[in-house]
Amino acid sequence: MKTIYLKCFLAVFAAAALFAGCSKNAETDSNPDPTPPAPPTPAYKVGDLYTKGFVKGIVVSVDETGEHGLLVSLNQCEEVWSYKVEEAMGSLPGSGAYNTSCVQKLHDWKEYYPAFVEATKDNVGALKNWFLPSMNELAKLYSAYTGHETNDTEGGTGSLNSIRSPKTGPETASASSEEQQRKDFFNKCLTDNGGDAMEDKVYWSSSENGPSIVFAFDMGTGKSIDTPSDLDKRARHMVRAMASF
């Protein structure tokens, strides 16, 4: 009798173990595969092509991670800053995005501010990615274009001057050659992607300096313009949009 009870107990125990194992397998099999990890955010460097959504341009500067920075548009044109004598920013300009937003709040800006119309023409719908750069942002574009830094860029306004180490004799020619190589490299990044090459000309900033004058930057000399007639809002200078990413 004891043998029969023992056999029955073992049979019941084996059945219970088998059922538990099947339930566990079924539970395990019902779980979906784990979600694959998201791809890492790409790290950019100066000269890279950035393209995401409706934004496409060449990287001008990046932060320490390489994930965020500034880029410049592929195209440029020559245009008047404004046909109106007024202070769109109250002579307190900030970043290019802020300055551009101040102009866009004016009900007639599309009629009287052609430089801003050109700078924002690639914005789609309510998106406001592109803007006319401030002096500080133009300084970063100049650095990407020539390899030289500028001073006095705090706050995005003021007089800018290229910082070049003083060189004489053969060193001068070498420095000039290095700068030209840098320009060729950056322009190739633009033209290889269907864009317009940068030029050693005066470029408008969005940094207003009064009712009738605006800061502008000479990409050839690396200096801000100080001739009043060249700073008149009705003068024609190069316009090149920038965007943050």
Positions of PLM-derived features:
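Extracellular adhesion/carbohydrate-recognition regions
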Residues: 34-130, 201-203, 213, 232-242
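Sec-dependent bacterial lipoprotein signal peptides
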Residues: 1-21
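Secondary-structure transition/turn motif
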Residues: 74-77, 219-223
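Bacterial Sec-dependent N-terminal signal peptides
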Residues: 16-47, 179-181, 203, 245
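An exposed tryptophan-centered "aromatic clamp" motif
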Residues: 116-129, 135-218
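Carbohydrate-recognition loop of C-type lectin domains
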Residues: 221-232
